[in-house]
Amino acid sequence: ADFGFPGIEIEGERITMRSWSETRESTRVFNESADALHAALEEVRQRGIRHVVLLGDYTDDGQRVTTETLKGILERHRDTHGTAFYALPGNHDIFGPCGRNHTKEFLTENGKGVLVSSDARRTGEGVVITDRMYCEGYPAGLDPMGAFGYFRQPDYLHWETPFGASDAPEDRLYDVRSPDGRNVYRLMDASYLVEPEEGLWLLMIDANIFEPLDG
């Protein structure tokens, strides 16, 4: 993904890379994830798999540009090979009703770190501010991946949500309250049931839970 800073360039291709010190402290793989995805999609092609389920955490941390980049990769694979994808959001793909800022450190071509943030309040020499780093909330965070199950598609034989047949976000809302009852938020449930071809049913349950804090 391109976050708008001078990163590492190899053979004319820009690479967004995290440091080893950050990678080793995480349970996730940062720098190898793109190659792993392309390798998995190539195996999908070779095996003739027609339907692929993405069970959450399909982005790094839901950054706008990361989600858009993934969308492009899946669209190209779908259009070229006819593979259908069905997504569910993980806790790293979307956050609550309004989203949240992210700040990450990346490597520059000289091996030094640069902070990239969506939070305009972050100041300091060398800090790159960009809204590409922002993680969207419901339903905006679903829109880029909307064609991958979240919303009804013309070729589906059947599609519905726990709230009925409408795929409109305003028809898929529910209230959540803080334990003291003082804070109430309206959230969208991204769950859906789809029959993409006769006899194949996929029950996709949005397991994200966002609990308002007291006060």
Residue spans for each PLM region:
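N-terminal active-site segment of His-dependent metallophosphoesterases
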Residues: 1-67
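Extended active-site neighborhood of metal-dependent phosphoesterases/phosphodiesterases
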Residues: 69-215
